[in-house]
């Protein structure tokens, strides 16, 4: 019997390590928009099996004092992982979710029956606070670095963060809440957010930087770990346990992805996370009136917050029936506020609540939409029950499922806004990146902490600890917290946008070159305060400096866009080149195939548009570089010899200015073809100009010349 148990123990330990190694090495990248994984070619069954065997041997030696029967009971859950390991690579995302769940579950069970009573070193609370503070600063620094890096590479859209900055900036200029890029409409005709702009607008007037909003966003996201710690202490968790709760927030993939929010930038709704955690801290501290005040203020952050509070109040009424009057009050206030804002205030600015039309398939008014599960079940359930929606729910719940299912009646409150986003019928909006998950994750994190502090044994405890002895309250809390932390770390690796992990931003950052060194040069060509149009990426470099208006607006004095825009706007680019009202004044080549075009209303500048290029981009152009007789220039020669059927041959000279030069000079070209020699004077005079300026000159070869056997370049002062 003992021999059989030992074999089972060895197999389960090996299976747990093999599952981790096989899935971790089998995923090259996770796509967080379309929700699939790209398999890795480095994954090997043989290598994974051997590595798992070595790791299992080391662990078995370490736990040799623990009875095999106990280890088997803890790790038997890994048998459920086997079907997911057999899935084809195209369905490997299911294996990822399964690994997140089973790794946390097994750790939870191990800590419940095999761990020591003292899980953490006995340190004073100030050390835990200091360590948490350092980690908070580290995450904030990483988030701001990623924000700056993506901004410098023009990966961030003007919307949404540019609009929030624009609205506050226009208000400071006397154009109250005006959104120039939307044709000058009032922002409150789109979203009603007085609670944010009330304090952000004067603060922006003092700081005057477009990056004020990302800094505030980073503080709201990762700085909320301090509030999670405070909430855990108010729930009578130890300093070490409270520190782990802070880690759960810091490594939560939803929180980390909200930093860039799918390249829409910082969203105002991130401000709701610290507000909700503060609300719970005040409730736990015995300050219900202050908590009620925070509740009222949170409604003004965004009208969708009221929908969350309606769902929260209803679920709390079901869980705490003896306090139903209090929750009926908060729910009634939230519902009344939502109806007031969406049916009267916002329509007063724009004529209607535009987001209501996104649910037109469910009904013609709010009542029909609310009853659509019964009135239009095919549309409602057909839109809701989809694979992508299931992935999003797993993404939100799995990292903290071991804790939040202790109060499962409150989970619908977290998912209400997520479900409403799914019912919009736009699959692009259902992903792991956008801000629509903010209210959900804020509440789930608060629920995670408060659920761990709940006394007694609930049905989820009996499920997660099935087959082993039910631990006491102290050990159970730490076991559940350990499972939550491990699942969160696993989820962070697969789904968080950061510098590491399967969803890291390295490949995205490598796609576009860093363009920040050219921003001052481009800004110098555009009059401060002037209106301009262009693409949503390039516009960010002029934020809080110029007014961004729609394409085709008569107010636009300038047009600025990059080569990445040409993937979508080739027709607009051709029209701009042919538009007599605007002239090209600057073309900056960052690398072959990537650059900027800047047009200005009015005639073309004397001598044509200025074309600028970097040294690195110049080296990648066709042809070969020749030694220049003037050190102020680089020269590349690209011969285009005549091919059969062609009548002429030519040589293209690409000349880049390496230093500003005030002198005037002329290049003399000597070309040889067999025994014949000809001298040419490049048809322009080279005056002083900016470093990096690029000139293209084409020489047509004499008739009969199908190639060149000799080339010399000289320079002489211009006459």
Stretches with model-predicted labels:
Residues 92-105, 225, 307, 412-463:
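Hydrophobic/aromatic-rich transmembrane helices and adjacent perimembrane loops
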Residues 35-37, 82-90, 193-201, 206, ...:
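Aromatic- and kink-enriched transmembrane "portal" helix at the membrane-lumen/periplasm boundary
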Residues 162-188, 195:
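Extracytosolic helix-loop segments that constitute the early lumenal/periplasmic catalytic or substrate-binding loops
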Residues 1-16, 45-46, 50-143, 325-330:
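Start-transfer (signal-anchor) and selected internal transmembrane alpha helices
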Residues 64-69, 267-271, 275-290, 317-322:
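Membrane-interface transmembrane helices that cradle and orient dolichyl/undecaprenyl
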Residues 71-81, 126-136, 240, 244, ...:
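Signature aromatic-anchored transmembrane alpha helix within multi-pass, membrane-resident enzymes
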Residues 142, 170, 323-406, 410-415, ...:
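Membrane-lumen/periplasm interface segments of specific transmembrane helices
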Residues 54-64, 211-236:
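Transmembrane-helix motifs of polytopic, lipid-linked glycan transferases
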């Amino acid at each position: 019997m003992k021999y059989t148990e030992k074999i089972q123990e060895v197999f389960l330990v090996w299976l747990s390590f093999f599952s981790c190694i096989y899935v971790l090495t089998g995923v090259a990248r996770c796509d967080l928009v379309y929700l699939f994984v790209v398999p890795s070619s480095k994954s090997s069954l043989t290598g994974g099996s051997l590595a798992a065997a070595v790791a299992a041997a080391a662990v078995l030696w370490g736990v040799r004092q623990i009875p095999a029967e106990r280890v088997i009971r803890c790790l038997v859950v890994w048998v459920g992982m086997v079907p997911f390991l057999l899935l084809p690579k195209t369905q490997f995302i299911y294996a990822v979710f399964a690994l997140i769940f089973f790794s946390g579950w097994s750790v939870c069970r191990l800590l419940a029956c095999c761990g020591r009573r003292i899980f953490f070193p006995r340190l004073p609370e100030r050390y835990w606070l200091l360590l948490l503070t350092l980690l908070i600063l580290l995450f904030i620094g990483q988030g701001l670095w990623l924000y700056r890096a993506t901004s410098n590479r023009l990966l961030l859209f003007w919307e949404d963060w540019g609009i929030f900055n624009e609205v506050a900036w226009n208000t400071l200029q006397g154009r109250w809440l005006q959104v120039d890029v939307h044709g000058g409409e009032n922002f409150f005709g789109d979203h009603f957010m007085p609670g944010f702009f009330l304090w952000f607008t004067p603060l922006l007037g003092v700081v005057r930087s477009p990056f004020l909003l990302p800094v505030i966003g980073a503080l709201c996201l990762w700085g909320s770990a301090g509030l999670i710690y405070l909430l855990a202490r108010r729930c009578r968790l130890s300093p070490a346990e409270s520190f782990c709760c802070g880690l759960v927030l810091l490594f939560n993939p939803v929180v980390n992805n909200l930093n860039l929010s799918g390249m829409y930038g910082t969203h105002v709704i991130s401000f709701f996370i610290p507000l909700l955690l503060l609300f719970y801290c005040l409730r736990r501290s015995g300050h219900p009136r202050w908590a009620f005040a925070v509740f009222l203020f949170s409604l003004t952050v965004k009208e969708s917050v009221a929908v969350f509070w309606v769902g929260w109040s209803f679920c709390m009424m079901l869980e705490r029936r003896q306090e139903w009057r209090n929750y009926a009050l908060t729910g009634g206030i939230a519902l009344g506020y939502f109806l007031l804002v969406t049916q009267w205030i916002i329509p007063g600015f724009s004529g209607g609540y535009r987001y209501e039309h996104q649910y037109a398939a469910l009904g013609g008014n709010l009542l029909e939409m609310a009853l659509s599960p019964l009135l239009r079940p095919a549309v409602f359930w057909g839109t809701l029950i989809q694979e992508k929606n299931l992935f999003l729910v797993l993404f939100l719940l799995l990292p903290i499922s071991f804790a939040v299912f202790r109060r499962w009646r409150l989970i619908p409150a977290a998912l209400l806004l997520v479900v409403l986003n799914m019912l919009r019928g736009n699959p692009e909006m259902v992903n792991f990146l956008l801000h629509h998950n903010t209210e959900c994750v804020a509440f789930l994190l608060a629920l995670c902490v408060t659920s761990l502090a709940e006394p007694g044994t609930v049905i989820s405890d009996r499920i997660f600890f099935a087959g082993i002895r039910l631990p006491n309250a102290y050990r159970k809390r730490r076991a559940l917290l350990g499972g939550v932390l491990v699942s969160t770390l696993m989820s962070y690796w697969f789904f968080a946008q950061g510098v590491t992990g399967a969803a890291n931003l390295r490949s995205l950052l490598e796609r576009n070159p860093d363009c920040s060194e050219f921003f001052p040069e481009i800004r110098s060509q555009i009059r401060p305060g002037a209106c301009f149009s262009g693409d949503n990426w390039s516009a960010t470099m002029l934020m809080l400096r110029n007014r961004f208006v729609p394409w085709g607006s008569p107010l636009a004095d300038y047009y600025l866009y990059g080569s990445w825009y040409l993937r979508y706007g080739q027709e607009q680019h051709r029209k701009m080149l042919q538009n007599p009202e605007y002239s090209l004044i600057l073309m900056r080549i960052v690398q072959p195939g990537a650059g900027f075009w800047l047009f200005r209303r009015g005639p073309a500048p004397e001598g044509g548009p200025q074309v600028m290029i970097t040294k690195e981009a110049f080296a990648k152009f066709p042809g070969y570089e020749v030694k220049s007789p003037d050190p102020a220039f680089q020269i590349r020669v690209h011969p285009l010899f005549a091919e059969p059927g062609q009548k002429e041959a030519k040589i293209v000279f690409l000349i880049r200015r390496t230093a500003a030069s005030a002198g005037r000079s002329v290049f003399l070209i000597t070309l040889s073809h067999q025994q014949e020699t000809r001298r040419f004077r490049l048809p322009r005079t080279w005056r002083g100009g900016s470093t990096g300026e690029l000139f293209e000159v084409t020489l047509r070869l004499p008739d009969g010349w199908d190639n060149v056997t000799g080339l010399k370049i000289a320079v002489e002062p211009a006459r």
